[in-house]
């Protein structure tokens, strides 16, 4: 290998050193100085791992002074190169630059430059890069993007709402499903879609303080969205880092109290340029035309500044008409400005609902009914569809569905309001109550008497709360270490129940964390019962581990002991037995407890066991909940209303449980009130809205389609390959779970999403739902998306060389595999990837420019090839450099046709879809005022920007592989 002083070479093994200069040569060794790092390297002349750097006409080079030059001619004299060309900055031509004056910090980014500079990647990295390009492009084109990656059951009505709302520009909607139907999950699905597509980047969630942790956990565990919790302390800290503290985070959760308490804080929130605002428990925002509450006014002010708003609220029937109108007013004050007019409008929807019911019943329609439908829809060419719907043909059902869809598009608040009820959604279990009446121990009787004397000045409410938890009264006098569990009959009953139901998973809920911890100790020490504990003092990771241990079938905990607050936001559908060791103070908390098991997807009837002590507030409350509200065995939408109306009487009975005179009458009155309210709610149900929110067959098909995509074996193979190449250790744990841990030889020292301790993953949705410690890996999971970014944003795998053993071809035959990428640059919020994601175009060229790619599929071809070590590869490249240049020029000439075809197809698709959506909404705007002007403007603006961006689309070479035929 001829070396001359002043020549420029690059290290094959340490490319980060930059360009080296030959500074010493003797008979056996050569010394290179690398000016950018100041380091020297001594190599053997005969077999040194370095590659000569030689540029060609057309290349752009940089001098050590920083100016650039386009090379037009290369001269060699005494082994040294001089480049002649035109300077980019001064346009001066005929400039000569000797290679010794080249910039030493040279980085080769183009695949061909890397190949010629000897920066040759491993063959498996090239294959991974191509697969990453291919799968990434395919995933953007897959239907229901953003709906496949969450750790949730595929429940049709939730998917229907999320699919409808998540694709809108700045959605402003009211989610008002009944309890247990998953409003939080629907909101999370919408957020996930909007964030993944780039339609939103900054999200603010406002929820009552008691639910903040639940939201934090749900967003992280189900959607991989890491929110920051802002309270007074965090806000004060952030003020040191930014003028507006909320600019320090993209995703924020705070409480209404936090927002309301400070005018400056509200101003900062309004100025923080959120894309989406989510408000949970929005029915607690009090409003009247004359006196809206401060909380309502604060949210109203925020809603004026934030483009997208999701309000989660109780059902409209529970709220009452005025309160329901107040929520809609937050979404669109221009549309909902007059309460009286709104009430009148609601009455007018009755004929539409009747028409929908008529169509769904499948009966033949009279001429009058057909005419009425035609008038309601108001389309000129509706006649053929009406005739088809009224015929006996096979198309009748689909025609009726289309008519129903058109009616719902044009009438009612269906674009801004979604509401599902348990009546309209299948899949809920029965709930069976088992009460166990137990005697009140003398120790408790004594403690209660003393407490009554000493606490005479306490309010009735405080006495009532004390009486619900006699063990705490006992501890007040005997000390925190008092062993109440030695005599409390509930403990004895619980141990007996658990030992006789060893095969059952049992969820035990009590009000306080201390009770849960004491029960765990007793169960473990006395009966050897495996019990996990779950309370608010534990970190999210500790709770995950406890939940995972409870979920394990054979070796897991039999019991999970939960405190009231600790169990928020967690669901354990795999268990169907629940023990309430004590009772919560109000019906909402009772429903929340039962809701841990009573979810869609629960496979068994729920057995609710309530051991209670006679002559205590527990005995009063268990009767009131069961006989007065029927709250154990059915959901109770009337609970809060009745609770508020009889609060004072109920508190007195709870505070003095031995004085029961008149209690039977109270229960009877409550039951009558409950039945009357329930009937009233049922009568007020909006069937039209339910049909729209539920989604019917369309929603079912959506769930089935995503379920099919869950079985994508390509993902598993790709992920394992990706983890191997990044350098992530994989340990198969069985049960469809794998433990990933970082290794010492990773491509990057800290891979986002992979902690030092490692993580457990699964590709199985059912396993992920049962095991909260296992992350559910899909194409949308951050681990995969970060891996794709790591490979595709750098030059990993962009140039390689392989040998093809094929005796049918002459030795030394050259093939060049080119991977071009066709793409358009645009802001993320345009969601250009719907039409033209970065798309790979593969070419396999021989030296005559014949493209053999269609004849030899990538994976088949890849299996026939053998790797070449880097040093041998560099020698091969140097030997055929001119031939490769010629083939590259042939590739450049051919790619334009393929790229143009892709770009034109994307333009046509974008124009067709966006124009159709705009036309549909413009037509509906004439008959449905719930379509906002700003939505139409945004779609038109989006269409124009998308078309302009596609006009600017181009292509570039992303990777290349040189293939040399051999017979050995």
Swiss-Prot record:
Gene Ontology MF, one: helicase activity
Enzyme class: hydrolase
Domain Helicase C-terminal, chain residue ranges per copy: 490-662
Record-linked InterPro entries: Helicase_ATP-bd (IPR014001), Helicase_C-like (IPR001650), Helicase_RapA (IPR023949), P-loop_NTPase (IPR027417), RapA_C (IPR022737), SNF2-like_sf (IPR038718), SNF2/RAD54-like_C (IPR049730), SNF2_N (IPR000330)
PANTHER family: DNA ANNEALING HELICASE AND ENDONUCLEASE ZRANB3 FAMILY MEMBER (PTHR45766), SWI_SNF-RELATED MATRIX-ASSOCIATED ACTIN-DEPENDENT REGULATOR OF CHROMATIN SUBFAMILY A-LIKE PROTEIN 1 (PTHR45766:SF6)
Gene3D superfamilies named among the record's database cross-references: 2.30.30.140, 2.30.30.930, 3.30.360.80, 6.10.140.1500, 6.10.140.2230, P-loop containing nucleotide triphosphate hydrolases, Tandem AAA-ATPase domain
Motif (DEAH box): 280-283
EC code: 3.6.4.-
Pfam families: Helicase_C (PF00271), RapA_C (PF12137), SNF2-rel_dom (PF00176), Tudor_1_RapA (PF18339), Tudor_RapA (PF18337)
Subunit details: Interacts with the RNAP. Has a higher affinity for the core RNAP than for the holoenzyme. Its ATPase activity is stimulated by binding to RNAP.
Protein's recorded name: RNA polymerase-associated protein RapA
BP term (GO), one: regulation of DNA-templated transcription
Binding positions for ATP per the UniProt entry: 177-184
Protein source organism: Shigella dysenteriae serotype 1 (strain Sd197)
Keyword Transport among record annotations: no
HAMAP family recorded: Helicase_RapA (MF_01821)
Keywords: Activator, ATP-binding, DNA-binding, Helicase, Hydrolase, Nucleotide-binding, Transcription, Transcription regulation
Helicase ATP-binding domain location: 164-334
Classification via CDD domains: DEXDc_RapA, SF2_C_SNF
Its job: Transcription regulator that activates transcription by stimulating RNA polymerase (RNAP) recycling in case of stress conditions such as supercoiled DNA or high salt concentrations. Probably acts by releasing the RNAP, when it is trapped or immobilized on tightly supercoiled DNA. Does not activate transcription on linear DNA. Probably not involved in DNA repair.
Keyword Cell membrane: no
């Amino acid at each position: 290998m001829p070396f001359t002083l002043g020549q420029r070479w690059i290290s094959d093994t340490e490319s980060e050193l930059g360009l080296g200069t030959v500074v010493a040569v003797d008979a056996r060794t050569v010394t290179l100085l690398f000016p950018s790092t100041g380091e020297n390297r001594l190599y053997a002349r005969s077999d040194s791992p370095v590659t000569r750097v030689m540029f060609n006409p057309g290349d752009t080079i940089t001098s050590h002074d920083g100016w650039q030059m386009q090379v037009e001619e290369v001269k060699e004299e005494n082994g040294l190169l001089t480049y002649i060309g035109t300077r980019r900055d001064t346009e001066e031509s005929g400039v000569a630059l000797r290679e010794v004056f080249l910039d030493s910090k040279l980085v080769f980014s183009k695949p061909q430059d890397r190949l010629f500079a000897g920066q040759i990647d491993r063959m498996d990295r090239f294959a991974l890069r191509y697969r990453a390009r291919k799968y990434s492009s395919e995933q953007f084109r897959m239907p229901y993007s953003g709906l496949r990656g969450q750790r949730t059951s595929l429940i049709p009505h939730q998917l229907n709402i999320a699919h409808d709302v998540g694709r809108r520009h700045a959605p402003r909607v009211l989610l008002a499903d009944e309890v247990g139907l998953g409003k939080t999950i629907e909101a999370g699905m919408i957020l996930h879609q909007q964030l993944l597509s780039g339609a939103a980047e900054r999200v603010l969630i406002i929820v009552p303080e008691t639910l903040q942790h639940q939201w934090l956990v749900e967003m992280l565990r189900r959607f991989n969205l890491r929110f920051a919790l802002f309270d007074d302390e965090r806000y004060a800290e952030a003020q040191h880092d930014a003028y507006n503290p909320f600019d320090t985070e993209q995703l924020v959760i705070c409480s209404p109290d936090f927002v309301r308490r400070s005018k400056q804080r509200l101003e900062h929130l309004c100025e923080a340029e959120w894309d989406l605002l989510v408000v949970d428990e929005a029915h607690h925002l009090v409003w009247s035309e004359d006196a809206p509450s401060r909380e309502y006014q604060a949210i109203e002010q925020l809603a004026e500044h934030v483009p997208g708003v999701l309000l989660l609220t109780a059902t409209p029937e529970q709220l009452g008409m005025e309160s329901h109108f107040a929520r809609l007013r937050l979404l669109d004050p221009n549309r909902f400005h007059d309460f009286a007019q709104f009430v009148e409008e609601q009455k007018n929807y009755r004929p539409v609902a009747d028409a929908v019911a008529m169509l769904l019943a499948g009966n033949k329609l009279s001429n009058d009914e057909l005419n009425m439908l035609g008038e309601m829809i108001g389309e000129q060419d509706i006649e053929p569809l009406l005739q088809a719907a009224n015929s006996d043909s096979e198309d009748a059902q689909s025609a009726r569905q289309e008519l129903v869809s058109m009616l719902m598009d044009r009438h009612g608040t269906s674009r801004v309001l979604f509401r599902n009820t348990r009546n309209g959604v299948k899949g809920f279990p029965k709930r069976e109550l088992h009460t166990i009446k137990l005697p009140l121990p003398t120790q408790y009787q004594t403690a209660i008497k003393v407490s009554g004397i000493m606490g005479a000045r306490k309010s009735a409410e405080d006495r009532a709360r004390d009486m619900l938890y006699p063990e705490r009264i006992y501890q007040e006098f005997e000390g925190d270490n008092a062993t109440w569990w030695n005599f409390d009959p509930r403990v004895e009953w619980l141990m007996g129940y658990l030992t006789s139901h060893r095969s059952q998973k049992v969820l035990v809920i009590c009000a306080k964390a201390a009770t849960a911890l004491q029960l765990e100790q007793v169960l473990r020490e006395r009966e050897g019962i495996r019990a996990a504990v779950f309370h608010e003092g534990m970190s999210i990771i500790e709770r995950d581990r406890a939940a995972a241990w409870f979920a394990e079938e054979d070796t897991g905990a039999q019991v999970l002991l939960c405190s009231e607050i600790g169990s928020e936001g967690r669901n354990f559908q795999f268990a169907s037995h629940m023990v309430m060791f004590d009772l919560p103070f109000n019906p909402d908390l009772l429903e929340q407890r039962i809701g841990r098991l009573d979810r869609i997807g629960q496979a068994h009837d729920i057995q609710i066991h309530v051991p209670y002590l006679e002559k205590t507030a527990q005995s009063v409350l268990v009767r009131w909940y069961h006989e007065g509200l029927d709250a154990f065995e059915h959901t109770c939408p009337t609970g809060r209303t009745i609770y508020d109306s009889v609060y004072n009487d109920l508190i007195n009975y709870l505070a003095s449980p031995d004085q029961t005179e008149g209690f039977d009458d109270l229960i009877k009155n409550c039951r009558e009130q409950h039945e009357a309210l329930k009937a009233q709610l049922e009568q007020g149900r909006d069937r039209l809205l339910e049909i729209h929110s539920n989604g019917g067959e369309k929603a079912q098909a959506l769930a089935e389609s995503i379920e099919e995509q869950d079985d994508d074996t390509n993902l598993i193979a790709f992920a394992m390959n990706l983890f191997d190449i990044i350098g992530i250790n994989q340990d198969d744990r069985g049960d469809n779970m794998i433990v990933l841990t970082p290794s010492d030889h990773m491509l990057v020292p800290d891979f986002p999403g992979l902690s030092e301790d490692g993580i457990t993953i699964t590709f199985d949705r059912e396993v992920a739902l049962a095991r909260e410690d296992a992350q559910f890996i899909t194409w949308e999971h951050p681990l995969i998306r970060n891996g794709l970014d790591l490979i595709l944003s750098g030059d990993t795998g962009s140039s390689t060389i392989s040998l093809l053993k094929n005796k049918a071809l002459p030795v030394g035959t050259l093939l060049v595999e080119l991977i071009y990428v066709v793409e358009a640059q645009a802001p993320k919020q345009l969601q250009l990837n719907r039409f033209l994601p970065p798309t790979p175009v593969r070419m396999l060229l021989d030296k005559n420019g014949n493209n053999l790619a269609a004849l030899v599929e990538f994976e088949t071809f890849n299996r026939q090839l053998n790797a070449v070590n880097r040093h041998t590869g560099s020698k091969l490249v140097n030997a055929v450099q001119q031939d490769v240049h010629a083939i590259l020029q042939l590739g450049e000439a051919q790619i334009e046709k393929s790229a143009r075809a892709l770009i034109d197809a994307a333009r046509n698709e974008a124009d067709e879809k966006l124009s159709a959506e705009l036309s549909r909404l413009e037509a509906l705007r004439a008959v449905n005022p719930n379509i906002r002007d700003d939505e139409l403007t945004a779609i038109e603006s989006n269409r124009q920007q998308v078309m302009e961006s596609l006009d600017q689309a181009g292509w570039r070479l992303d990777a290349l592989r040189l293939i040399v035929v051999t017979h050995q």
